[in-house]
């Protein structure tokens, strides 16, 4: 009987299986590398030079976020507190606590404490803290319940898709401006978050940008 197919076709099924395995492995690697929480830094919790507890300072002592992050309402970036801010209290309070060694050394040398950054805006992206907090977006929406954290960690993925989801549905995060820094605020009066958010969205004529130029400048 005549052989209608060339000899190389005998290996065709094996080649197809090999290509499928390579493609499957590549797809698994891309998913693991780009879409897992580890890649997006979720849960990233570096050990800081000073073991600062937001739970103690905010929840237990009642300090306002703006005492330390004093530029958050007027600047695109929320500042890390200076050593002077820390020493306003700690010249008297817990002055001999060894956990404050890095603060004291900074105070004496004039060199800033080498705090480790937790939340990092992606490259080529623009984010303005003042615009958000002055239009009813609380710290909690991006940073989680920081007021209950002993050690700050990255709570959200902060990817482009995550940002766009909020820009498409801002009502899920809007709250009265007076409650932006009340990190334990919950809707009251029988209204849901969506009802309050939709009312504020209409009242303030909020229409967040969804085009590229909104965040990539």
Segment roles from a protein language model:
Residues 46-100, 128-217:
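Sequence context surrounding c-type heme c attachment/ligation sites in exported
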Residues 115-133:
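Short, solvent-exposed interaction modules
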Residues 28-46:
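Aromatic-capped interface at the extracytoplasmic side
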Residues 1-9:
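N-terminal Lys/Arg-rich, disordered targeting/topogenic segments
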Residues 15-32:
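Hydrophobic membrane-insertion alpha-helices, especially the h-region
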Residues 43, 49-51, 112-114, 124-126:
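Residue-level preference for alpha-helix termini and adjacent loops
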């Amino acid at each position: 009987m005549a052989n209608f197919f060339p000899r190389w076709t005998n290996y065709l099924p094996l080649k197809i299986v090999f290509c499928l395995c390579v493609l499957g492995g590549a797809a698994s690697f891309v998913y693991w590398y780009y879409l897992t929480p580890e890649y997006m830094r979720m849960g990233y919790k570096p050990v800081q030079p000073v073991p600062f507890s937001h739970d103690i300072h905010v929840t237990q002592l009642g300090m306002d976020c703006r005492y330390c992050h004093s530029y958050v309402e007027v600047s695109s970036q929320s500042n890390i507190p200076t050593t002077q801010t820390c020493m306003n209290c700690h010249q008297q309070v817990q002055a001999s606590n060894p956990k404050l060694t890095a603060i004291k050394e900074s105070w004496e040398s004039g060199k800033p404490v080498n705090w480790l950054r937790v939340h990092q805006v992606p490259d080529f992206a623009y984010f303005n803290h003042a615009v958000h907090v002055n239009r009813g977006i609380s710290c909690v929406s991006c940073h989680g319940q920081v007021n209950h954290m002993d050690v700050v960690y990255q709570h959200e993925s902060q990817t482009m898709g995550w940002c766009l989801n909020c820009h498409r549905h801002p009502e899920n995060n809007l709250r009265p401006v007076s409650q932006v820094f009340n990190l334990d605020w919950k809707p009251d009066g029988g209204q849901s978050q969506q009802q309050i958010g939709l009312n504020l969205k209409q009242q303030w004529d909020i229409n967040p940008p969804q085009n590229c130029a909104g965040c990539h400048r």
